[in-house]
Swiss-Prot record:
This is Disease resistance protein RRS1. Residues 1204-1272 bind DNA. One of its GO terms (molecular function) is sequence-specific DNA binding. LRR repeats lie at residues 498-522, 535-553, 554-575, 577-598, 621-646, 665-688, 742-766, 768-793, 831-854. It is found in: Nucleus; Cytoplasm. It comes from Arabidopsis thaliana (Mouse-ear cress). InterPro entries: Apaf_helical, Disease_R_plants, Leu-rich_rpt_3, LRR_dom_sf, NB-ARC, P-loop_NTPase, TIR_dom, Toll_tir_struct_dom_sf. The keyword DNA-binding applies. The keyword ATP-binding applies. GO terms for cellular component: cytoplasm; nucleus. Its main location: nucleus.
Length: 1378
């Protein structure tokens, strides 16, 4: 965002001028590092008009007030502070954070004033902690209590977006962010923008794209966003192209609804430079299709943990409300919101302020009944873009079809005249409907808002188009006549249904009433009628007091009436539009009398209608596909249905009086005859295209003609000859307990033979030659004949096998399951292409050499401990503890066979492995796992040269009694910064259980071990990986098979990393450096570099700063004697710096430092200068020495002008430079200084310094006012190493310059100044002005801090402290003079 005023989430810091460029600058930078880029520093607090400041503060999300602790809380300050509080009252959502900065005995007075104004969020500077700790506390407070709420759950999504961007080829990359309203698309896009924008030449974030384009126009919007501050107006796109041609640009278009407008926008930007990125957020996937964006990220809802955290923060709920009750309430809210951040936060804010749990529960029920306007508005904007048919389909689904089979819904809606195949896809694209597991689903909020649309159309129940609330339907249908006081019947007129009603779904679970006979008379347009009972334990009681139903609407497509109490449907009912009749447990004897038009009927279900005796009328339904008459015990015959060509399924199970079936349709797929009186099927019954016969038949002749029969289930016994099976593809004889043997089936074309559960089967003569899948689990077979070479799956789970034939020649065998074969003694060998091997619970003592292709090994409960040494193993459970502890160390050692001169080709062929074990089995293992889900390792120089890969150990906590862990895996993200300072990453996903395989019940937690040599940083020069400072960060996330994060169900509790080294095969088991509590944020190149610097010894830090400021690109031979002169060990120091990648030494002996390294060195010097000035200005003084506050009056200034040489020691006063400006007609600028004791002693002395026009070696100094304190008399350096380092650097500047002057031109790399020699006292005179100006350009810092370069040349500007420490004589000890 270019202007923070447009961002409702920015921080405004109010402060005084004195701390703006010291403490406040550090605070601002820390906020930006946390991702809060919009920070406004307001110093107008000194301005009593306060208008501009007030406007800024009112718009801010957080207002930070930095108060000077060393100033008396006078009326002036309190007035200013009151104005800040007034701004906060105008913005009730704004947070106010107070910071009391500076040591003072007036602290108690400030705290009293702040407490009086009701402010509890107060931070104070303390003697026992540094400013950096104070800054960290303030940033944490601001972020976690305000900004963090909006970004809960964003980090894992950022990783996925980043990965999606990185996978795209170089060029103009495009990513679409898609999701339902309120799911966090804009928040995620802003987070991506904040993280990535700094890496682009230009960037823009266009919020509410369609509205912005309409209001401002394309060119004006682009000029405002991409070229802020530009004077010229862009009239043509070509002008913008000329200014941004070939530049890397980041463009974010938020909330795009009109695909055509976005498409035209993007078509004009094919000239952007390679690496440009365009991100579009939309709730309509069709936008991405039209814009040609293939990489689409679907934003998922928050997991349970994140949702609860957001709810509690939004509602400001305290835990003292009762942990159990609070948990139940939060679960209900979270379950209803289903991970939608907008809904969770809105409901949380609506419940905010409710002190009692009962009040919150009541408020929540009201919110469910009438969702808040903000949520309704967000969802209704998508609804308003639909066509009329799409709206009708959406409302039908919202009111009636939640969770129904999508094919069932499509069939009904097609019968209503809609085009659901297309229109449901539109609803899915607009995030209003989802299809999961072949069922139609709506988010609970979406469903309630859809129903609210219906209820909002009219307050008259009888005129609402769709009815689903039982109480309102009962009101319309209930019989309304009764006797009063024994008098004749009195009729009370009630409102009856109208022709506006299109759908009526009545749940009778809690109802008991009489239905009036003419209840449906006026519902002429009723399409969908369903009367059902959702509670199977309740018997509904709905009666017809008159014993009749006068009519049903002729427009019905669905007639679903459970427990229908009458003997037939109304005779005047015309069912020509009916698509489905579903009337289970009815009292029907027949549907109706006579012949009806049933041309639209697709399904009829009359199951368990025990009075049904006649269904002959169904023969007229030529399009009928399903007939379900299960449990119709009085039905005696099934009519010849040969003419029903579309009939696919017939279920006559339980029709005990049916003795025969005369004719079966030719396209029948499923025929259920269990429990019938049918003993045999005639030959003409089995047709060539039958696919499945399900029945316990004693004889099925004619199977040789069934050329398309694919499944034959559960025969009691096999035929004496299997030749009648013809072209059968799948033979399933599962659980045929009486089957004892099978004949030779070598000539059959079977692909699948399932004999599972045939507990009496003890022999097989031969297998089909083309068999692919063989299931022998639970059989009594001890030996099997030669297996066919086409076999792909062999499952003998729990069988009595004792041996297997040699399987080495089975090239296609991929899965071998021998689990539970307790009698299995030997295995001769495995196929070379085997991928999955299961032998859990066997007694094998040795396992043959496993093939290279093996991916999964399940050894649960196996007695074998002599496992092979290679590759990837899963489900490694319940081995002895020693085996588990030793296996990882042994497995890592196996990579020692890789030669030292390895290549990428050899790395790609190197073994990888993984295994898992319950954590309780390795409690005594020395794995050194660290708490948390991330860990950072440091590689020393030798490791980096021979790095092969990493071994990773991850402990995952599973929920109690979690049974299905088949879908669990671990995503590992490896991050590092290359030597150019760019952040790099690689991600690999590891799954410990093969998809679709049943794994043993997991314990509470498991340790997973992975190794993959491809999981390593990319190679730099030679074999040295391109890793900056040797720091590599690993982060671990639990995922499912679709790589979706599972943090809501599983938790990574501990993790660890080991280095695989090619030279020795060792794994750095003891020397690896592990960093705990690593924040899960991207480690930038600067942060990696700073970590390396902070870990250096003090003298190595000094050496680095020397090189950063003076000796970049210099020869080592030139630098060494100069550095040695100040007692620094050059040889070891340079090696240390090179090992952590702070410098590098080229092949010709030059010290090379990249730009980011030099930048960090300058910033360190800059920061130390700030600390120096801060320390000088805030040194503790006796309170009695502080002059009392006097009335303001203008003092007369004492003016004195002197001229001194530029190298003179000066007046020995301590000055602080606060400005500089060019003087008209003068060659030299004028510097402005004030006494460093202005704020501690109230000293008003100032001076102006300018070089002489006639003699540039002379300085003209003008003194204004007198000092009110004694002149300092002694030299002193800061007690801490930071200041001493800064001082030593400053001192060396002059020395280095002098060395250059004495250098012989003929010997450029041989300095003539020996390390022990003492340069002349006036050596600084020889420092050329051009060198001085060049150095000033290279080391430019802010003008309002002490300039350490000037300190070196003008000692009179240096502070002369009172005491002395070991650093105070540093320069004198090494004979440095100025």
């Amino acid at each position: 965002m270019t202007n923070c005023e447009k961002d409702e989430e920015f921080v405004c810091i109010s402060c005084v001028e004195e701390v703006r460029y010291s403490f406040v600058s550090h605070l601002s930078e820390a906020l930006r590092r946390k991702g809060i880029n919009n920070v406004v520093v307001d110093v107008d607090i000194d301005d009593l008009l306060f208008k501009e400041s007030q406007a800024k503060i009112e718009k801010a999300g957080v207002s930070v007030m930095v108060l000077p602790g060393n100033c008396d809380p006078s009326e002036v300050w309190l007035d200013k502070f009151a104005k800040v509080l007034e701004c906060q009252r105008n913005n009730k959502d704004q947070a106010v954070v107070s910071v009391l900065y500076g040591d003072s005995l007036l602290r108690d007075q400030w705290l009293s004033e702040l407490d009086f104004r009701g402010l509890s969020r107060i931070h104070q500077s303390r003697k026992e902690c540094s400013d950096s700790i104070l800054v960290e506390e303030i940033v944490r407070d601001v972020y976690e209590t305000h900004f963090y709420v909006g970004r809960i759950g964003i980090y894992s999504k950022l990783l996925e977006i980043e990965n999606m961007v990185n996978k795209q080829p170089i060029g103009i990359r495009c990513v679409g962010i898609w999701g339902m309203p309120g799911i966090g698309k804009t928040t995620l896009a802003k987070a991506v923008f904040d993280q990535m924008s700094s890496a682009f030449d230009a960037s823009c974030f266009i919020e509410d794209y369609d509205k912005s384009i309409h209001e401002k126009g394309l060119y004006c919007l682009l000029e405002e966003q991409l070229l802020p501050g530009n004077d010229a107006t862009i009239m043509k796109l070509s002008s913008l192209r000329d200014r941004l041609n070939s530049k890397r640009v980041l463009v974010v278009l938020d909330d795009v609804c009109n695909a055509l407008v976005a498409e035209s926008f993007l078509e004009g930007f094919d000239w952007l430079g390679p690496g440009s990125l365009i991100i579009i957020t939309s709730r309509d996937k069709q936008v991405f299709r039209l814009c040609g964006i293939n990489q689409i990220y679907e934003v998922q809802g928050l997991n349970e943990k994140e949702a609860r955290q957001l709810f509690l923060l939004s509602a400001s709920i305290m835990e003292d409300m009762g942990e159990q009750n609070l948990h139940e309430l939060s679960v209900r809210v979270i379950s209803y919101a289903n991970g939608n951040p907008l809904a969770i936060s809105v409901y949380g804010r609506e419940l905010k302020g409710k002190k009692k749990l009962s009040e919150m529960e009541t408020a929540f029920l009201k919110l469910k009944r009438r969702p808040p306007f903000k949520i309704v508005d967000a969802f209704k904007s998508s609804y308003d873009t639909l066509s009329d048919n799409e709206k009708n389909i959406f409302l039908d689904i919202a009111c009636f079809f939640q969770g129904e089979n999508v094919n069932y819904v499509i069939q009904l809606l097609e019968g209503c005249g809609f085009f659901p195949h297309v229109e449901i896809d539109v609803l899915v694209d607009k995030c209003l409907v989802t299809i999961s597991e072949n069922r139609v689903w709506l988010h609970k909020l979406t469903q309630d808002i859809g129903r609210e649309i219906i209820n909002g159309e009219t307050v008259q129940i009888e005129r609402r188009r769709r009815l689903w609330e039982p109480w309102s339907i009962k009101y319309l249908l209930e019989y309304n006549e009764h006797k009063a006081n024994g008098e004749p019947k009195t009729t009370f007129k009630r409102a009856q249904g109208s022709e506006e009603i299109e759908g009526l779904f009545l749940d009778t679970s809690n109802l008991r009433f009489d239905l009036q006979p003419s209840a449906f008379k006026n519902m002429l347009n009723l399409r969908l009628l369903k009367i059902y009972c959702s509670n199977p334990e309740v018997h509904p009681v709905i009666n017809f007091p008159t014993g009749s139903l006068h009519s049903l609407p002729n427009e019905l497509r669905l007639l679903h009436w459970e427990n229908y109490p009458l003997k037939s449907l109304p005779q005047n009912f015309d069912p020509r539009h009916l698509v489905e009749i579903n009337m289970p447990y009815s009292q029907l004897q027949k549907l109706w009398g006579g012949t009806k038009n049933l041309e639209m009927l697709r399904t009829i279900r009359l199951c368990h209608s025990q009075h049904l005796v006649d269904i002959d009328d169904l023969l007229k339904a030529e399009n009928l596909e399903v007939i379900d008459l299960q449990g119709c015990t009085r039905l005696q015959n099934f009519p010849a249905a040969g003419r029903l060509l579309r009939l696919r399924v017939v279920n006559l199970s339980g029709c005990i009086k049916i003795k025969s079936v005369l004719e079966i349709p030719p396209n029948i797929e499923k025929l259920h005859l269990q429990g019938t009186g049918i003993l045999a099927l005639p030959v003409s019954t089995v047709k060539p295209n039958h696919r499945e016969l399900v029945n316990f038949l004693t004889e099925i002749p004619g199977l040789s003609e069934a050329s398309k029969l694919e499944r034959l289930t559960s025969l009691l016994e096999s035929n004496s000859s299997c030749q009648d099976l013809g072209k059968l593809i799948c033979l399933e004889l599962k659980d045929c307990s009486c089957l004892q043997s099978l004949p030779n089936m070598a000539n059959l074309d079977l692909n699948v033979l399932d004999l599972s559960g045939c507990s009496s089967l003890n022999s097989i003569q031969g297998f089909p030659r083309f068999l692919k899948q063989l299931y022998l689990g639970g059989t009594a077979i001890r030996e099997v004949p030669q297996l066919p070479q086409s076999l792909e799956i062999l499952n003998a789970h729990g069988s009595c096998l004792r041996s297997l034939p040699n399987m080495a020649n089975l090239e296609f065998l991929k899965v071998l399951d021998l689990s539970g074969c307790s009698e299995l003694e030997t295995i001769q060998g495995f196929p070379r292409n085997l991928k999955e091997l299961y032998f859990a619970g066997t007694t094998l003592r040795e396992v043959p050499q496993l093939p290279l292709s093996l991916e999964v090994l399940n050894a649960h409960g196996s007695d074998s401990e002599k496992l092979p040494m290679h590759y990837k193993f899963n489900n490694f459970f319940d081995l002895s503890q020693q085996v588990v502890n030793d296996f990882f160390l042994k497995a890592l050692t196996y990579v020692k066979h890789i030669p030292r001169g390895y290549t990428q080709e050899l790395i790609n062929k190197a073994p990888t492995f993984s295994f898992s074990a319950p954590s309780h089995t390795n409690q005594n293992a020395t794995f050194d796992l660290q708490p948390g889900s991330s860990v950072m390792t440091r590689l020393n120089h030798s490791w980096r040269n021979t790095l092969v890969g990493f071994g990773m150990l991850v402990e995952v906590a599973f929920p109690e009694d979690y049974c299905d862990a088949t879908d669990v895996g671990i995503s590992c993200v490896c991050r590092w910064s290359n030597k150019e300072g760019r952040s790099c990453r690689i991600e690999r996903n590891f799954h410990c259980w093969a998809p679709g395989k049943v794994v043993p019940k997991v314990r509470k937690d498991h340790t997973f071990v992975f190794s993959d040599v491809n999981m390593r940083p990319s190679t730099g020069e030679g074999n040295d990986p391109d890793i900056w400072a040797g720091l590599v960060v690993f982060e671990f996330f639990p995922i499912n098979q679709q790589t979706k994060c599972l943090n809501d169900r599983f938790t990574v509790t501990r993790c660890g990393v080991r280095v695989i080294n090619v030279a020795t095969g060792n794994t750095s088991l003891e020397n690896i450096s592990l960093v705990l509590s690593l924040d899960p944020v991207e480690v930038s190149g600067y942060e990696v570099l700073r970590v390396s610097y902070d870990d250096l010894q003090e003298m190595d830090k000094v050496l680095f700063l020397y090189i950063a400021s003076l000796f970049n690109d210099e020869d080592v031979d030139f630098v060494a004697p100069l550095i040695a002169g100040i007692d620094l060990d050059v040889s070891s120091g340079l090696k240390v710096l090179a090992d952590v990648s702070l410098i590098s030494v080229s092949s010709n002996g030059e010290i090379v430092m990249h730009s980011l390294q030099r930048q960090m060195g300058k910033e360190i010097l800059h920061g130390q200068s700030m600390l120096l000035s801060d320390c000088e200005s805030s040194m503790t003084e006796n309170l009695s020495d502080v002059p009392k506050k006097e009335k303001k009056h203008r003092e007369s200034k004492v003016k004195k002008v002197v001229s001194i040489p530029a190298i003179d020691e000066g007046d020995l006063w301590t000055w602080r430079k606060y400005g500089q400006k060019d003087i008209l007609g003068s060659r030299f600028p004028r510097g402005y200084y004030r006494c460093a004791y202005k704020f501690t002693h109230g000293c008003k002395a100032t001076k102006q310094v300018q070089r002489s026009e006639t003699d540039s070696n002379m300085l003209a100094i003008t003194y204004l006012s007198e000092h009110n304190h004694p002149r300092p008399t002694k030299r002193k350096a800061l007690a801490d190493s930071t200041r001493s380092t800064s001082s030593s650097i400053c001192s060396a500047i002059t020395t280095s310059a002098s060395s250059r002057v004495f250098q012989n031109k003929d010997e450029p790399n041989q300095p003539h100044l020996p390390s022990s020699s003492t340069p002349p006292r006036n050596a600084a005179v020889l420092f050329k002005m051009t060198d001085m100006e060049e150095f000033q350009d290279n080391m430019e810092v802010d003008n309002d801090v002490v300039d350490t370069r000037t300190l070196a040349l003008f000692p009179e500007f240096q502070h002369q402290p009172e005491e002395e420490d070991p650093w105070s004589t540093f320069f004198d000890d090494y004979n440095f003079y100025f």
